[in-house]
Amino acid sequence: MENNPYFKYLPLVPTKGELFTIKAPDLEVDKILNKGFFCLPLGNALFRVGATYNWKDLTYETTENGKSELLEKIDSLLTCDYEIIDHKAGIRPTVRDRRPLIGLHPDFPSLALFNGLGTKGVLIAPWLANHFSDFLENKSPLDKEYDLRRVKKRK
């Protein structure tokens, strides 16, 4: 976002995160689990599990530290056997106050933003997408907690 001329004033911070895809045939869960990390059912005994936080290493490479952290988190929640299918790393936009930014640009209202969901995106994205859609289509007010107008644009 720092190179985006319209939204570069927003306090988005790049954060590296690592996650696993695991296979756990004995884990019978059909909802997202959240215990300081998420476990998202994908179907066919596959689950996406994550994520880690790293503000210094902004590469797309997986790390042994990330792997160890994820294994520790999984083992604190799951009592069944599992197999690691995939280990990935990526960069996600986060906001210092950990609240996503949604809304219309203050000077160019035809530009909309839906960003900064961070790791909680997996949990909040469905509700926030409906909320934003209602705002765009029905002119319903945005929740102040997520409205990008909470960030003052510097002149």
Please state what every model-predicted region is.
Residues 83-155:
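C-terminal catalytic lobe of FAD-dependent flavoproteins
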Residues 1-109:
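Active-site substrate-recognition segment that forms the wall
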